[in-house]
From Swiss-Prot:
Signal peptide: none annotated. The gene is ttc9c. The keyword Magnesium does not apply. It comes from Xenopus tropicalis. PROSITE patterns: TPR_REGION. The keyword Repeat applies. Keywords: Repeat, TPR repeat. TPR repeats lie at residues 15-48, 79-114, 115-148. This is Tetratricopeptide repeat protein 9C. Belongs to the TTC9 family.
Length: 178
């Protein structure tokens, strides 16, 4: 067991190192390298994630046993890497909104109250023209960070777009059944 604990700690340490290098690249506006490093960190963490292993005994690899501290560190590192990956993808040209949305959902599955993930899920939904979803995520973000100007701005943009969309839909249906 001690040998396995050491291997787990080494894996977490390596993933943390990739994440730190990714953070450095992010602050230096080297988004492509940052994305690559966050991916490497997540790949490193995959080997520890029990949810990815087969529930059938004897089929596929067996799950690694983590102590509570390691499990918490795994969860935090995964959430941080997905959140940072979403931030990079949001700043890429052109922004990759579908991937931002997917990464944000990964964070929210691990940390449902994460304001940055709620905001990014809302922003990406807005740009994907899914205004109902955008409103849902941005409202949650606004309730947790009521003074954040970016969140307020996107809530207003979303409300306007949602209102326009509903009005156009109403006009369309009136024309059909008029």
């Amino acid at each position: 067991m001690a040998e396995q604990t050491g291997a787990v700690d080494q894996c977490l340490l390596q993933a943390s190192s990739f994440k730190s290098q990714g953070n450095k690249c992010y602050t230096e506006h080297r988004m492509r390298q940052a994305v690559s490093l966050y991916h490497k960190a997540l790949l490193q963490l995959r080997s520890l994630d029990a949810s990815l292993y087969s529930p059938l005994p004897g089929v596929g690899p067996t799950a690694v046993k983590l102590n509570s501290q390691q499990a918490e560190e795994l969860k935090t590192l995964q959430a941080d890497c997905y959140n940072n990956l979403a931030a990079c993808l949001l700043q890429s040209q052109p922004p990759r909104y579908q991937r931002v949305y997917e990464c944000s959902l990964q964070v929210l599955s691990l940390q449902p109250e994460n304001v940055k993930a709620l905001y990014r899920a809302g922003v990406s939904s807005y740009h994907l023209k899914d205004y109902t979803n955008a409103h849902h995520y941005l409202s949650q973000a606004a309730s947790r960070a009521p003074k954040d100007g970016n969140i307020k701005r996107y809530v207003q943009l979303t409300d306007t777009a949602l209102s326009t969309f509903r009005e156009e839909e109403k006009q369309r249906y009136q024309g059909m059944f008029g």
